[in-house]
Amino acid sequence: DRVCYVNDVSLEGSRLVQTIIYDGNEITGPSDWVVDRKQNRIYLYCTIGKMRMLKAFHLPRLNDSDENGEVHLKAEDSLASIPLCAIAIPRGSLLKGHYAYLPDGLPSRERRLHIVDIVSCQKVANFDLNHIPYEPEGVASRGGKLYLSFHTPRDVRANMVYRFKVEPVK
């Protein structure tokens, strides 16, 4: 299933408040979801045929849910499909401005951070992460810097976060 679980997180705990499901059957391989709150969109980062894509949708509101707390998106609900470069495993991506920051790779393969302009659909940067011996898991930004988390084997409490200053972070 192509599912995004929406949780309400507070200091007291968390609870599932919505499940977003993509009902299209053209997607093969792994997928991930990326939220762009400023543009009120959600992107499905997926593979269609042999092409990695970002499929844009309006970000569902909580009251868009059915009686089961679900929102079902269909192919015809897509606002745009943005072709991406060859990226092995979609995960933990970030949209900021009109850029998608896409970590990629495993210790047994190449590890990179791809930056794609989602307006022009062009790759604008490709950062080599092979000097870091861990698997990139997620990316966030704050104060003009990117924070990239890496999975370390055997102990999730030992995960590493690296800080980068790269353009075009704004």
Name each region found by the language model.
Residues 1, 44-48, 97, 103-105, ...:
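Recurrent small/Gly-Pro-centered beta-turn motifs in extracellular repeat architectures
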Residues 1-34:
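Hydrophobic alpha-helical segments and helix pairs
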Residues 2-8, 50-60, 108-115, 155-168:
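Structural motif
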Residues 15-24, 69-85, 122-128:
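A short beta-strand motif characteristic of beta-propeller blades
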Residues 25-37, 83-93, 132-142:
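Repeated scaffold domains used in trafficking and secretory/extracellular systems
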Residues 38-40, 97-98, 143-144:
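Short coil/turn segments that connect the beta-strands within blades of beta-propeller domains
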Residues 80-118:
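Loop/turn-rich, solvent-exposed surfaces of beta-rich toroidal or solenoidal domains
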Residues 137-170:
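Blade-level signature of beta-propeller repeat domains, shared across WD40, Kelch, NHL, RCC1
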